[in-house]
Amino acid sequence: MKKPLSLLALVLAAACAHAAEVKLVEQADKKQVDVLVDGQPFTSYVFWADQKKPLLSPLRTASGNIFTRGFPLEKVAGERTDHPHHISSWFNYGNVNGTDFWNSPPEGYSRDSKMPYGNIKHKAILAMKSGEGVASLKVSSDWILADGSKVLQQDETLVFRAAK
């Protein structure tokens, strides 16, 4: 009788354990997709019109504390105002065919690069899937050189997993 009860306890424990729901919510008017974990904000994939590149902002810990800085998107008392191209979290490179995609600061900030700046323009949300413990967002972006020509198309899948 001891073994069946132990097995039953294990099965019940596994059935009661549940992974957090990871939900993607598109806000077309704001040009962003919010990532929620059990209904609480984790981050947003943002692709605002005046942005030089799509990014994740802000990033939060599991307890909800924001750990990315606000500058240059917003002013936060006591926060440093250097490196205006360090806008939350993003993926790109510093030199693609002689164009700098890394150091592209927002309009009005000084240029640090001797190379021309490129832009990464969000084109489309290709797929969104929310679920228990994991969500995925597939997007497409064009990398645009300073002369306006497209150097590459980037299709990427961002995967968000909830801690167990």
Regions found by a protein language model. Give the residues of each.
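Short, intrinsically disordered/low-complexity patches at protein termini
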Residues: 3, 15, 59-60, 66-68, ...
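Short small/polar-residue motifs
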Residues: 18-30, 41-42, 116-127, 155
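Bacterial N-terminal signal peptides that target proteins for export
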Residues: 1-8
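Hydrophobic h-region of N-terminal signal peptides that target proteins for export
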Residues: 9-19
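Extended, loop-rich substrate-binding clefts of extracytoplasmic carbohydrate-active enzymes
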Residues: 82-163
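Beta-strand-rich N-terminal accessory domains
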Residues: 20-84
